Amino acid sequence: GIVRRWSVILNAVPGSRLLIKAGGAASQCVRAHLDAAFAQHGIAANRVLLAGHAPKTEDHLDLYNTVDIALDTFPYHGATTTCEALWMGVPVVTRVGDSHRSRVGLSLLTNIGLPGMVAESDEQYVQLAVRLANDPVRLKRLRTEIPARLRQSILCDPARFTRQLEDALTQAWQVRTSR
């Protein structure tokens, strides 16, 4: 599962920590459950940080300034959280799957020109994250490049997005009616 993959990454990057933002973060039950889950993989509780709901959008987005890499969940990808990470310049590593729920990260990263951040397997997911964590020069470069890539992409250009969607729908209609 995802805890195992995140633990492998934490074990491979000494001194690293994982920030998990969740509505139930203040719950002692959630804390105990996560501590036990990560402990099974040799991760001390002080390496897994929990953050709860931030009442202000600015405070929520400011948390992205405290992380170097966003590790997408699997099989359910982040959508809004992935967009927020990219908006804040945080590179996202994702693991692609076969269904919509596990292809959102692929779509977002491909549309900003970063398909190399998409893993096809659990092993590749870990390798991408560890390699990136050990490359501070690339991390710094991505921190400034990613917001510009996002702003210039089709994701932030509704007119261009709509034209491409219209073209795709027209093509699908033509294929369907030509049978």
Q: For the regions a protein language model found, what residue spans apply to each?
A:
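Conserved catalytic-core segment of nucleotide-activated headgroup transferases in glycan assembly
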Residues: 1-56, 63
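Short acidic active-site motifs
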Residues: 58-59, 81
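Acidic donor-binding loop of glycosyltransferase active sites
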Residues: 63-76
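Catalytic binding pocket for nucleotide-activated donors in carbohydrate/polymer assembly enzymes
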Residues: 73-158
